[in-house]
Amino acid sequence: MAFGDREVRRLLGKGINHYGLIENRDRIVVAVSGGKDSMLLLWLLRERLRRVPINYELVAVHVDPGFDTRIALELETFFKDEGFAYEIIRTDYGLRAHGPENRENPCFLCARLRRSALFKKARELGCSKIALGHNQDDMIETFFINICYGAQVAAMMPKQEFFGGEIAIIRPFALVSARNILKMCEDLGLPILPTSCPSASKTKRSEIRAMMEDLLRKNPKVRGNIYHAMSNVNLEYLPPTLPVRGKRGP
């Protein structure tokens, strides 16, 4: 087994245990887009069942945004061949998000609709958790997107509860790099399906990703340092909040 593959398994387990992501008898929806992260997450969460002293159930769920139905068909074949329980939700969310009637950011609307569909399906299936494939790079990129474009210090949570704790979104790859995930997918021969979204390469995330790639070329330790900084905030050395524009002080 390659060192990178062992490291992915180790960090997956560390993230699950440290953040308390999976418990005995959990029933978990694994959101599968067909990309490297969600495909490997589904594979490793099932593989992990052979090595841990707890039991949990997995249901792969693909929300088809309506761009290219072939992706849903390829995923359905993969789920059947590999023996995964699965659900395919066919929608027009992507088309609606990019349609003339939508005045919002298409990515924002599409993501909101897909998440709503996942919540609904989780309830139908009796699942209390939804596992997403976001990796450490995604979490760092979100951190910088919020700083650069949202004027706030915020990122993704490894575990985030909704509806009073009825359903939790979990991100088991919180400690795992995108590079190691891609390498392990290739080592295992897992299919990686291309995105059919027309906005995939035109987002703020792609701009931040290019910036991060430049930083990592100069110093590979930057990724880990930034991730740890997100939970090591020294408020003593941050400026006080500025007054909101248009509001007078006391």
Predicted features along the sequence, with ranges:
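Alpha-helix boundary/capping detector
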Residues: 71, 105, 144, 148, ...
